[in-house]
Every structure is written in C-alpha cells, then in structure tokens.
Amino acid sequence: MDIFSWQLGLPSTLACLVFGYLLGSIPFGLILTRMAGLGDVRKIGSGNIGATNVLRTGNKKLAATTLLLDALKGTAAAAIASLWGVEAGMAAGLAAFLGHLFPVWLSFKGGKGVATYIGVLLGLVPVMVLLFAAAWLAVAKISRYSSLSALVATAIIPVALYATGNGKVALLFAVMTLIAWVKHRANIQRLMSGTESRIGEKG
C-alpha cells in the first residue's frame, strides 16, 4: 500500500476534519478545574491545560479525569470516523489532536497533545497503546520527568507502526510526533538546562 495515497474524497475528508477538530478542541482541563473551584489552570505551573499541569493543583482525581477525557476525545474522533474507513479515522484523529493543541475557544492556545495522541492511537491501532504506556512508564520511573517520558514514547510509536506494516498510520503519527515535539520545545530546553519540573512537583 502506498503510504502517500489518499482515497477518501474531499467532502468526506473535510467533514472528518471539522468533526475531529471540534471534538478535540474541548478544553477539559480548564473546564474541570474551574468547576472544581481551582481557578484557571493556565495561571499555574506550566500554564498548560493538560493533565500534567492539572496535577500541579494537587487534585490527583481531577488530573486523572482530565487525562481520560483528553484521551477519549481523540479515541472517539478516530473510532467513530473509522466506521467510514481508516483514512476517515486518520483525518478525524489528526484534527482532534490539532484541536487540542489549537482550540478556537481559547484563542488557539491549548495543550501539548500527549493524552489526545494516546487517544487517537487507541482509536486506530489499540495494541500500540501498550507499547506507548510501557515506554512512558519506564522513562518516568527512571527520570521522574513527564515530558521526557512523552518525548521518548511518541518517538517510538511511528517506528513501531512502520515496522509492523502500518505504513500510512505510521506517517500520520510521525507528523503528530513532530508537532508534539515542537509543542514541547520549552520542556526540551528545560530538560537540557536541568530546570524541568519532575512528576509530583507543583512548580
């Protein structure tokens, strides 16, 4: 199969992109912290709306819920659209990922996309979530850096997908990985300077 071929028609592709983007742009971290009376999560820690920064509020249950919902919006977008074929699922999944990163409701300033990345992976190639989790947990146990764990895990996934014959999906996740790394550029700089916050720290 040509990994660069695209059989899905333009109207269907656009519909999947819009559906995925709108679903992915729901800022669950911000919504949940405000509902819990914890204020604006963008004003603490890294300023991110994702689960890692929500954890810095000290509310582990809220952080876990944010992680779950941010992942599920990626899963829902990819899985529902996949009923019309893998390309539809890929389009919706990518759009959900981008929606989380650049939500229209927050002036296009969103999260870094790791949870939604996992969710899209679950919706398209579920077994690969086990590899992602294993890589993330191994690096986290050794380093206590959530960002480094995510960077390593996202780097592994496209390679593993390609090696197992999922070339087209591997290309999708290579693009998503590149975007995720760009969104983590400040984390990469802090990792290099030794100033990155470790898991469990509020700073």
Swiss-Prot record:
Report which reactions are catalysed by this protein. Answer: an acyl phosphate + sn-glycerol 3-phosphate = a 1-acyl-sn-glycero-3-phosphate + phosphate
The membrane topology noted for this protein in its Swiss-Prot or TrEMBL record is: Multi-pass membrane protein
InterPro entries to which the protein is assigned, alphabetical:
G3P_acylTferase_PlsY
Name a GO molecular-function annotation.
acyl-phosphate glycerol-3-phosphate acyltransferase activity
Its EC top class is: transferase
Q: To which pathway does this protein belong?
A: Lipid metabolism; phospholipid metabolism
- Compartment list: Cell inner membrane
Note whether Cell inner membrane occurs among the keywords.
yes
Query: A GO biological process this protein is involved in?
Result: phospholipid biosynthetic process
Transmembrane residues, as ranges?
Answer: 13-33, 66-86, 88-108, 118-138, 156-176
Q: Which residues form a coiled coil?
A: none
Q: Any idea which UniProt keywords this protein has?
A: Cell inner membrane, Cell membrane, Lipid biosynthesis, Lipid metabolism, Membrane, Phospholipid biosynthesis, Phospholipid metabolism, Transferase, Transmembrane, Transmembrane helix
GO CC annotations?
Answer: plasma membrane
**Summary of the function given for this chain in its UniProt record:** Catalyzes the transfer of an acyl group from acyl-phosphate (acyl-PO(4)) to glycerol-3-phosphate (G3P) to form lysophosphatidic acid (LPA). This enzyme utilizes acyl-phosphate as fatty acyl donor, but not acyl-CoA or acyl-ACP.
Quaternary structure annotation from Swiss-Prot or TrEMBL: Probably interacts with PlsX.
Task: Return the similarity comment.
Answer: Belongs to the PlsY family.
Q: What is this protein called?
A: Glycerol-3-phosphate acyltransferase
Q: Which organism is it from?
A: Sinorhizobium medicae (strain WSM419) (Ensifer medicae)
Instruction: State the encoding gene.
Output: plsY
